[in-house]
Amino acid sequence: MSLILSNVILHKLVKNEQDELEVCLRNQLLENEEFTEALVSELHRVFNSKAGKGFGIFKTESEFGHWLGSVRKNETPFLEFSNKSAEKLKSELIKYPFAEEGILVIAEYQSLATEYLFVAVLPSNESMKVTDELNISATDYLDIAKMDIAARIDLSTWETDSDSNRYLTFIKGRVGRKVSDFFLDFLQADVGMDTKVQNQVLMQAVEDFCADERLEKEEKQQYRKQVYDYCNGQLQAGEELTVKELSGELPTSESGSNFYQFAEEQGYELEESFPVDRTALRKLTKFVGAGGGLSLNFDAMLLGERVFYDPETDTLTIKGTPPNLKDQLTRRLGSSES
């Protein structure tokens, strides 16, 4: 991956003897050399591969946004911007119970004609290494794969499209809303495009289109499968789905309208493109549910053929039990009768 580096800096978040978080500031930018480019390239790659990212936009009063704008206009040196950002990050981080030590990296770079600003707190872990004398000693390393406090601003979009609701991307993190809340507070940003909602609206639009066109059951299943195949292909490739491109993959109705026109006319307010949500996608081809000690998962095409649901009695009937399940049930019933 070829990147063009503009500015890269590292600062360190450490805890003092009183277990209070402090910032150790680096006094100059990193040199634009091989290791610096390798670091930023890996950060860019890992960030792209992270699932569950959220989108945001700067609030009007965002200090971080104003500082960044000043840097982009060459009114403020990048080093000064990074120092102020590091201090602000610390002041926000100490409000949360997950405040930990780490390496703050702030990088301004270009990839594929798009300019970015990347901000992340990287875990610094200890490991072992073998020296040239074949002795064992301790060494520290950056655990980039485990980063969950990170955000990236698409500078090109931010500066050219004031109506964009997704130029800021952040990792939501595995510890729930707290990490994303903290980073949004630090950046003084609001949540922008909701990927999950966009996917849910898309799936509902697909169902409504099938109903509006009065497709037969088999036609509906085929239509859903084509939607699934396209979206899953984009997901596997790490690409976003494009509504117009998806529509082009689907057959035009007998009335001559296509899915894209339908979605536009019915006012679903879908973005032109957005990331695929795996959970929403799965519901196109499967019914999944769990609760009360019961877990069910079956292909949607089986509903009405081998699986029947009666809403009045809230009863699900399955005809043709899977062989391995049938064997378990038979053995259990047999042992209870003996």
Curated annotation (Swiss-Prot):
Positions of region (Disordered): 319-338
GO MF annotation terms: double-stranded DNA binding; single-stranded RNA binding
InterPro entries with a match to the protein in the record: Nucleoid_associated_NdpA
Keywords, sorted A to Z: Cytoplasm
GO cellular component: bacterial nucleoid; cytoplasm
Signal peptide: none
Domain of life: Bacteria
This protein's name: Nucleoid-associated protein VSAL_I1059
Organism expressing this protein natively: Aliivibrio salmonicida (strain LFI1238)
